Amino acid sequence: MTLEEFSAAEQKIERMDTVGDALEEVLSKARSQRTITVGVYEAAKLLNVDPDNVVLCLLAADEDDDRDVALQIHFTLIRAFCCENDINILRVSNPGRLAELLLLENDKSPAESGGLAQTPDLHCVLVTNPHSSQWKDPALSQLICFCRESRYMDQWVPVINLPER
């Protein structure tokens, strides 16, 4: 590896960390503003009804999910719909960290609630446009620019690794 290649690889890693931090900030704000839709079925319903209001689509799966044929078909359809409607798409490689960010801290565990609680489907997460302008949010602007740059390099669904805390 030459010095130029090493420097380029190091810059790419730093850029991915920055994009991961921006995604974390966008999810935090969207959660507090209640502009998140969680679940493959719920996402499909929203995309069918109001695709113009969706600014970001996250697809999350681990290695076990990669063998789930039905889920992969859903992902393919969602990706195609998002590309057709100019919706930015990111693939999250660590769904466990995504679950930590999206699940409410005050939610009780199944043992505490006295029954079996169903874990929400976090394979697909949509962030919708809040009433205020999306361009006022620098983190969302950074994600949109990253998605656009990735498309220019023929990477239509870039993979992001959310930073562990």
Swiss-Prot record:
GO MF term set: kinase binding; promoter-specific chromatin binding; protein heterodimerization activity; protein homodimerization activity
Conditions for induction: By various types of DNA damage and growth arrest.
GO biological process, one term: negative regulation of angiogenesis
Pfam families reported for this sequence: Ribosomal_L7Ae (PF01248)
Principal location listed in the UniProt entry: nucleus
Keyword Nucleus part of the UniProt annotation: yes
SUPFAM superfamilies found in the cross-reference section: L30e-like
Source species, domain of life: Eukaryota
Modified residues (Phosphothreonine): T2
Keywords: Cell cycle, DNA damage, Growth arrest, Nucleus, Phosphoprotein
Subunit and interaction comment: Interacts with AURKA, PCNA, GADD45GIP1 and MAPK14.
Function per UniProt: Might affect PCNA interaction with some CDK (cell division protein kinase) complexes; stimulates DNA excision repair in vitro and inhibits entry of cells into S phase. In T-cells, functions as a regulator of p38 MAPKs by inhibiting p88 phosphorylation and activity.
Protein name in the entry: Growth arrest and DNA damage-inducible protein GADD45 alpha
Protein species of origin: Rattus norvegicus (Rat)
Taxonomic lineage of the native organism: Eukaryota, Metazoa, Chordata, Craniata, Vertebrata
